[in-house]
């Protein structure tokens, strides 16, 4: 059974699964679907087309699925898709996509999006990510699984943040961040790898040692990216984690943060 506060406004076309809660003064607009067990707090605005999965919690004053302010957007029917088990804290804004890209903004599963963070149009957030307070992603940004973006991190449009990457507080990212890499500063500079995060997630000492050596190949030996990638070929063939690191460099369109 759903629990809908009588002061909430639910459009007749919205689809709410069993066990959904909607708090007072929240607005669930047309073409919004909310999955089982999701809790919508007070003063939340949900605009469609938006699909929200199961067992999410969205806190007060968040605006989810609003039109993008991108000037090329002309009212086309784009969408937002949010997975399961996400926590979206106070004042978060997430915009739908544009037809010039995939026409979809995507948020995966088990993410923590903290207060006043912004996810721009056409962005793709993986699983188990943390966006700390006031993190702001421009349009078309991709964030890999398990990445952590500390408070006030700013990410330029089209940047890719690799899996398990980490940014320090107030970092301004203008280029791609390879998987596992830790960046700090404005503009961002690579400082190390997220070894503490790896240990917490159960990476073996052997894998951490190999990744440390691979980081030095890319960032400490003065090699060009092309030459560094050649050096990574052998360990990448032996360790999928190194291949993830290597591939995040190979696929970079904006160039990697150095």
From Swiss-Prot:
One biological process GO term for this chain?
Answer: lipid A biosynthetic process
Gene3D superfamilies noted in UniProt: Hexapeptide repeat proteins, Udp N-acetylglucosamine O-acyltransferase, C-terminal domain
Q: Which SUPFAM superfamilies match?
A: Trimeric LpxA-like enzymes (SSF51161)
Protein keywords: Acyltransferase, Cytoplasm, Lipid A biosynthesis, Lipid biosynthesis, Lipid metabolism, Repeat, Transferase
Localization per record: Cytoplasm
Q: Which PROSITE patterns match?
A: HEXAPEP_TRANSFERASES (PS00101)
Q: What is its EC number?
A: 2.3.1.129
Which reactions fall under this protein's catalytic activity?
a (3R)-hydroxyacyl-[ACP] + UDP-N-acetyl-alpha-D-glucosamine = a UDP-3-O-[(3R)-3-hydroxyacyl]-N-acetyl-alpha-D-glucosamine + holo-[ACP]
Q: Which domain of life is it from?
A: Bacteria
Keyword Lipid metabolism on this protein?
yes
Major location, coarse class? cytoplasm
CDD domains named among the record's database cross-references: LbH_UDP-GlcNAc_AT
Q: Which InterPro entries match?
A: Acetyltransf_C, Acetyltransf_C_sf, Hexapep, Hexapep_transf_CS, Lipid_A_LpxA, Trimer_LpxA-like_sf
Q: One GO molecular function term?
A: acyl-[acyl-carrier-protein]-UDP-N-acetylglucosamine O-acyltransferase activity
Subunit text: Homotrimer.
Question: Member of which family?
Answer: Belongs to the transferase hexapeptide repeat family. LpxA subfamily.
Question: What the protein does?
Answer: Involved in the biosynthesis of lipid A, a phosphorylated glycolipid that anchors the lipopolysaccharide to the outer membrane of the cell.
Q: Give the matching HAMAP family.
A: LpxA
**Protein name in UniProt:** Acyl-[acyl-carrier-protein]--UDP-N-acetylglucosamine O-acyltransferase
Q: Which organism is it from?
A: Pseudomonas putida (strain GB-1)
